[in-house]
Amino acid sequence: MGNADLRTLAAIEPKPFDELGGSVVAVDAHNWLYRYLTTTVKFTRSEAYTTADGEEVANLIGVVQGLPKFFEHDVTPVFVFDGGVSDLKADEVEKRRDQRERYEAQLEAAKERDETDAAEIAALESRTQRLTDTIVETTRELLARLDVPVVEAPAEGEAQAAHMARRGDADYVGSEDYDALLLGAPYTLRGLTSNGDPECMDFEATLSTHDLSWEGLVDAAILMGTDFNEGLSGVGPKTAVKLIHEHGDLRSVLAARDDDIPHADRIRELFLDPAVTDDYDYDTDIDPDFERAREFVTETWGVPADEVERGFERIEESVIQTGLDRWT
């Protein structure tokens, strides 16, 4: 999820949705789904997001509840899904899996205690959330029935989204992860799953504010710590930038301090030259099949109609109002 300390360095300004009309947002699909599953949909009634067979379907509620915000402001989302993971990312995934298993044990223990309050259980449930194959595949299918554009990344969806934005094929990246800055995303919208307006991280303004190159920003982040490495002891955002200014780059900093960060060059490459593709194509003129979408959510997966009907109505109304339905 990236190092939250990057926020200290990021140039961030509020971005009202009303100013986003006509834009295309390349959304990190896994990040967007995870936020909905852990912060939004989890607080609906429990039977609404789990089938009788125990399959989680909260993602379907999240898609239906989350899309109207885009369409009501004439914003086209393009959902970018993760592909494979690097060896270093696989190590991080394994660490998160181990941590999640510990939280799952705590959750089971909490449920067995009569005095455990609902807030504690909700917090533990959010920490044990995982994106299962079923969640990812049913999300793809629902987006397809709603004719919402999808791009398949060869590796990290966020890296692919940043690449698309740098090529001019998207106006913004949509992600809660501060690593979007390190991937060179020109403009990143955070808070797309919240009730209010999002905020926008500006890549070039961030570099200018701290007198850093893209490489320098990545080097500073590695010194602070990333998903792929522990940072140097006592090195926070201000110190990291100062060290890069004093020594020029990551290698020189490490040499001057007689220190080491394992796989530092590979980590740099993951941010500066990630696996991405130009082999994608999508149409922003959408043509939703609402009947098939409703059928998929409420009949195929058994989501209570009252949980999603207003969302479907808002999508349908907004598609008409914003002129996205070229077929009318």
Swiss-Prot record:
The keyword DNA repair applies. GO terms for biological process: DNA repair; DNA replication, removal of RNA primer. One of its GO terms (molecular function) is DNA binding. Its EC number is 3.1.-.-. CDD domains: H3TH_FEN1-Arc (cd09903), PIN_FEN1 (cd09867). Residues 120-248 are annotated as: I-domain. It comes from the Archaea. Keywords: DNA damage, DNA repair, DNA replication, Endonuclease, Exonuclease, Hydrolase, Magnesium, Metal-binding, Nuclease. Mg(2+) 1 binds at D28, D82, E156, E158. Binds 2 magnesium ions per subunit. They probably participate in the reaction catalyzed by the enzyme. May bind an additional third magnesium ion after substrate binding. Its cofactor is Mg(2+). Signal peptide: none annotated. Residues 1-100 are annotated as: N-domain. Mg(2+) 2 binds at D177, D179, D227. Residues 320-328 are annotated as: Interaction with PCNA. It is an enzyme of class 3 (hydrolase). Pfam families: XPG_I, XPG_N. PANTHER family: FLAP ENDONUCLEASE 1, FLAP ENDONUCLEASE FAMILY MEMBER. HAMAP family: Fen (MF_00614). Structure-specific nuclease with 5'-flap endonuclease and 5'-3' exonuclease activities involved in DNA replication and repair. During DNA replication, cleaves the 5'-overhanging flap structure that is generated by displacement synthesis when DNA polymerase encounters the 5'-end of a downstream Okazaki fragment. Binds the unpaired 3'-DNA end and kinks the DNA to facilitate 5' cleavage specificity. Cleaves one nucleotide into the double-stranded DNA from the junction in flap DNA, leaving a nick for ligation. Also involved in the base excision repair (BER) pathway. Belongs to the XPG/RAD2 endonuclease family. FEN1 subfamily. Interacts with PCNA. PCNA stimulates the nuclease activity without altering cleavage specificity. This is Flap endonuclease 1. The gene is fen.
